């Protein structure tokens, strides 16, 4: 990493269960980010076509009844609106990155065969798919929707911003998964999430300090009123996802955000000097590690 680069977290609400319309919205937002001079845009966890909230997914656990039947209809719609990789929607995302000459990182529901995966796709400014990572372990209700990820993408990619890598939501709480990125030299750490709690920010501050990297946490923002009317939502607040996106420095301080309860774009300038100074005292996979005693093996 060298110099100063501008990045963006795009806390936007998808057009729920409408893949094409959501990508249309993404395209407009990426154009705005590019016009502001940012070199990377990060979107929330499974932005395309929507994050599967427990407000309806809980009903998938039932064997019968009207709610279970309605939830299965919604699951079928989610499957039909998911992204295939490679495929036309992935190609369109790649073209959006190329047309705007930036790095585009977006969370998608990815369909592979008969299984949906929670995936992070990172496209390069030349329109290539540079990183394809599937969430290793779905959390709680998500196990009714997504399959288990694999070891692909547990690494960084070289970019003009520095080495970029990422983990999805609560996989960021898995120490070995984090260390996989540390030993790959991560400098810009992507953390798309659906966790809109205050506790999440304690984790992000810790990860920034532990990794000595810049951390971009982009969180789901979703209103109950934005769902199609036939989605069986359990009673609850209007905000299904309250956001809380933020960009953090290697010392755990905020460079931008948190942004709560609304759509918006966060920008921050990442200065490589901050990263280098932070690593004088601590480097988790370098001078403050003991590879002679402790070693991570990725299968």
Go through each PLM region and give its residues:
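Extreme N-terminal starter segment of soluble prokaryotic enzymes
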Residues: 2-9
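N-terminal phosphate-binding loop and adjacent alpha-helix
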Residues: 11-28
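Cys-nucleophile CN-hydrolase/nitrilase-fold catalytic domain and related Cys-dependent amidase chemistry
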Residues: 19, 31-125, 195-197, 201-213, ...
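Active-site catalytic loop in hydrolytic enzyme cores
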Residues: 84-85, 89-91, 95, 110-187, ...
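Short beta-strand scaffold segments in enzyme catalytic cores
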Residues: 106-108, 119-122, 155, 245-247, ...
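C-terminal beta-strand edge segments of enzyme domains
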Residues: 220-299
């Amino acid at each position: 990493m060298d110099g100063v680069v501008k990045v963006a977290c795009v806390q936007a609400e998808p057009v729920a269960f409408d893949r094409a319309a959501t990508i249309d919205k993404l395209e407009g937002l990426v154009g705005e980010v590019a016009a502001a001079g940012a070199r990377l845009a990060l979107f929330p966890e499974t932005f395309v076509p929507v994050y599967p909230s427990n407000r309806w997914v809980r009903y998938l656990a039932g064997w019968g009844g009207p709610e279970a039947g309605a939830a299965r209809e919604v699951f079928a719609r989610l499957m039909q609106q998911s992204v295939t990789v490679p495929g036309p929607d992935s190609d369109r995302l790649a073209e959006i990155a190329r047309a705007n000459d930036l790095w585009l990182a977006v969370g998608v529901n990815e369909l592979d065969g008969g299984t949906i995966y929670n995936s992070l796709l990172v496209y390069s400014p030349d329109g290539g798919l540079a990183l394809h990572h599937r969430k290793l372990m779905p959390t709680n209700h998500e196990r009714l929707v997504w399959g288990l990820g694999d070891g692909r993408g547990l690494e960084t990619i070289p970019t003009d911003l520095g080495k970029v890598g990422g983990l999805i939501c609560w996989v960021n709480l898995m120490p070995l998964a984090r260390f996989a990125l540390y030993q790959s030299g991560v400098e810009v750490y992507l953390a798309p999430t659906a966790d809109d709690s205050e506790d999440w920010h304690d984790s992000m501050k810790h990860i920034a300090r532990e990794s000595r990297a810049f951390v971009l946490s982009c969180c789901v923002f979703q209103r109950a009123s934005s769902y199609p009317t036939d989605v069986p939502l359990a009673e609850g607040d209007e905000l299904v996802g309250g956001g809380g996106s933020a960009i953090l420095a290697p010392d755990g301080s905020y460079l931008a955000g948190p942004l709560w309860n609304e759509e918006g774009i966060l920008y921050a300038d990442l200065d490589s000097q901050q990263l280098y100074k932070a690593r004088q005292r601590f480097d988790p996979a370098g001078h403050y590690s003991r590879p002679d005693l402790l070693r991570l093996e990725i299968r």
